[in-house]
Amino acid sequence: RDRLRSRGLGDVYKRQVLCCWAAWSKWASTTRIGLVNFQNYQTASLVKSNEDNFIEYEEIPLDRLDRLGRYDLVLGFGMGLKITEEQRAQILAAADEGTPIYIYAATNPENDICSLDSLTKAGISAYIGNGNKRNYRNMARYVRQHIDAKRLFVTPAEEAVESASDVLYHLDEDLSFKTVADYEKYLREQGIYREKAPKIAIVGGLNDPFSGNRANIDSLIVSLQNAGMNVYPVSSYRQRLAFLREIGPDAVIHFAHGRMVMGQADAAVEWLKERNIPIFSPLSMLETQEEWESDPMGMFGGFMSQSIVVPELDGAIYPYVLNDQELDEEGIYLFKAIPERLKNFTRIIGNFISLKRKPNAEKKVAIYYFKGAGQSSLTAQGLETVPSLYNLLKRLKAEGYTVKNLPATEKEFEKLLMTQGAVLSTYAEGAFDDFLKNGRPALVGKSEYESWVQDALPEELYADVVQLYGEAPGRYMSTVREGEPCLAVARIDLGNVVLLPQPMAAVGDDAFAIVHGAKTAPPHPYIGAYLWAQYGFGADAMIHFGTHGSLEFTPRKQVALCRYDWPDRLVGTLPHFYYYTIGNVGESMMAKRRSYATTISYLTPPFTESKTRGQYKELMNKIEAYYKTDEARQPEASIAVKKIAVKMGLHRDLRLDSLLTQPYTAEEIARIENFAEEIANEKMTGQLYTTGVPYSPEKIRSSVMAMSADPIAYSVAALDRQRGKVTDSQLKSQAFFTQHYLEPAKQLVRQVLGGQKADDALVCRVAGITPEKLAEAHTILTPPRRGMMMGRATTPTEYTADQKREAQAIAEVERTVTNIQNYKRALEELSLIHISEPTRPEPIS
């Protein structure tokens, strides 16, 4: 009986415990919010904003979507959400089983999943859409109060407030300023504002300055202020350009994720160009410093596109890693400025501004050029290098730069380059002795060089150099002065301008491989040449003259460089300018991204036609006669063609027989005709471009013709083919294409150059379309805007492949026709910019 009574009491106790547990779970237990596909910095803002002990956030990996039922709300971030059909089914199943789920900001309609009622969805959207610390905190409380429906330990949620936008801000995250005047008044009241100090505007950023996760922003503001600058952080999308105009900054720092001013991109670029305001685009990495430094790529994919590639359209420079994400004591990833890189980036900004403000006579410039070993001349793609460099030096002197001892003639200057600016091979011992005697190199003692190395290079990086080449200064380009080993740095001293031949980036015989990416650390002379410019000469700016050298191809990362990447270390904090051909976009991107270069374009050699049509006139006449001849007499006409083709040697180029008794077939005649037309229409470059020597009007016209005629001809042909007006076999005939498309295109270019208005009416006439068709092409090729209304994505119109191809051909006709005069003006301006005498009082830098 006692056992039964005891068992009964136990059952009662268990029921009481279960009832208490049920009551606790229903009314008081911790509210769990699961996060799907949120970036670390977004998660950090949500977690750090939460002040309630009975609310927790947890990240849910995509491979654990089977656990969604454990959460009181599953909140997903739809942008960039890539899930399989199976994973999507798991989310839908959890929603069907009663789990509150909301995928916010879904860009894929299939991921637009929400099991909340419309009012609750609107409430969550209002909180997260106006993301700031206060709204995030109240969103968590709203979830506990209204979605999880808890009764105990509940702090009532306040209404969502509109996040501060189109404002300036400072270190106090509770303050914002609607006008520049109000902001400057605040700075003066705080004793921070400096009269006549440089103004630095900060725009963009992955992390919102009002979200709580902003230590990196605060660090940058403080660092720039401590360097004597007035800092203007702007939080705005719609009024960004208006704020910049009101501020009038000396420089803009854009934490980029796309264009700097959406909707006004071109207007912003023009405004900045007019005022010579540089845009810096430092990078924020979504990983820890250790992870980033060990990654050989640095950055890739869509994140690289938005952070590096697209900002280049605005003219952004210095894709310099400034921030990373680090774990705090709670295991939350927070954005942090990397101390060493923040210090260097602040110096970079200061050095650029100093370069703008310092008198030309005081500026010190180190100019690197490229030449082979020994008596090889200077080289640069498409450039007459020696006369161009000589013209630049004369221009610098005319602009007030301190250029001393410049030879009176170009010939004497070239001789100076060969004696004092030589590049010596590792085997040229006799030549090196002569160079020491007559070349006047800068001698850098071992102790001084190693002190520079200690300041500029990490120990691990320099250890690779010592392992490969031995202790400094090594055996190459080294000597002894007063008992101390020294590096001999080749340089030509012209006062405040110094010329340096770029040394070999590695030791070996394969010059091409050395220039285009030696896989090893550079030798001491290479390092010494760059460190001497910074520490020995004290340069204010570095210029690489001509396309191209080896700096941007030294190891390691492709982009988003770190302290273990050679270009990052050798450029240091110097403003770097690269005089680069306009015709090599691919490798110029390497220069911009891997050596932080601001590229200054020079023209390609002017284009002309080969002018060989006259040589083929007799042949083309015989071919035309062949086509007009009746079938019975065609063998005779074919042999007439063959005699001329063999006489001109065309049979060898086309690998045809030379037996003059055997006629060519119709197919072989067509091959000869196409080959002759191709040669006759071939574009070729004339003499190399010389800086300071403008194109002649005729060369400008021939270059515009070469740039314009082909795109128009091929685009119109593509439209005609799509409409069934021509066949593929007709378009394969070079003679047919020339007669029906290329020659009319050339005539059109001549007419526009002669003054015909290049407007929509002309575009429609050339393309054979109506104005409505032109407007439709614009619509098809315009990327769909991601219209967000309470997190819902709009569905873009779908177009067929034929519609897209037609639109692209129409757009190419429009682009080319409307730019014919622009090409002409650009060539005129570019060829005049670098004339040897100044045309305007402003310094060219």
PLM regions: where:
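Alpha-helical hydrophobic/aromatic positions enriched in membrane-embedded helices and signal peptides
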Residues: D2-R3, G538
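Extracellular interaction modules
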Residues: R3-G10
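Ligand/cofactor-recognition surfaces for anionic moieties
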Residues: D11-L832, S836, R840, S845
